[in-house]
Amino acid sequence: MVRLREANIQANYFLESKDILPSFFCQGGAKSDWLWSVRLDQQYDCIIIAIGSNELACCTVEQLQDRLNDYSYHLLCHGFTKHVIIMGLWPRKSEIFSLRARLFNKLSRHNMYWHSGILFWDWSRKLTYKFDGAVHLTKNAYRRALKFIISPVQYIFPYNSK
């Protein structure tokens, strides 16, 4: 619990500090091939791939893992970002799906993708908003991604959707 509190403090500090505000790139769609829409002349602290219910319904954990590994390899190895996170909103509540995602996060700590992960949360108005016909992530969603980067162990062992 202490590590989670420290992660909260650090995430708030990063998001509210004007001097060291992290840069984010967020693109929705687990199925869409958006990889080349990342501006290749910029570097990002974190790239978040947001996935909604329609795409999660037809994805398996293995497909998410493959996609995350592909993106991590291309984006991390070529220096475009430091972290790649797949953020699943509106998750399927099956225990086996959650267990396999947790296991993948645990295993990814021991290979080159340790700074990547798959996160799942219940949808809430605090995480997304609609603007110009598109769904965007809020500051709270970025804060959760930062907490994962700062203290990933909190999201590997106890599954908590809040």
Regions found by a protein language model. Name each.
Residues M1-I9, G28-K31:
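Catalytic nucleophile-elbow at a beta strand-turn-alpha helix junction centered on a G-D-S/GDSL motif
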Residues F25:
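Acidic/charged coordination and interface sites in well-structured regions
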